[in-house]
């Protein structure tokens, strides 16, 4: 708190405090500490290394037959100025309900239907049935480190989710 007062002052209102906190978090999340962009793919884009034959085949599959790049786009994001592997849209992929999801064990009133809960995604937030089941297209950055996969963690491995799409 002393550092906060030193930076933002003693007279900051509750609203301005929240705005300052939000700004500080957003700045940190944009920093190189959180987003170093140091993958082999980044080095390849910068001309600092070559991809192996197998990696090039994978990239071609990602861009073409796999259709991955339709949603996990390979162009620089306007805001980030880097490839984020997401188009920031919401899609319904039909991922099955995950019986291992800890939410199913949450008691009422937070989960009133128990194991029969369906996550309606964006549709629940917007109260719009045409948006039911839509979830944000995630980034694929460091994807090998972020298991499980799918909006609800249904897929335990990358192989499982790739097979689901195929």
Predicted regions mapped to residue ranges:
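Extracytoplasmic redox metalloprotein regions
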Residues: 1-56, 60-61
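Short glycine/threonine-rich turn/loop motifs
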Residues: 37-164
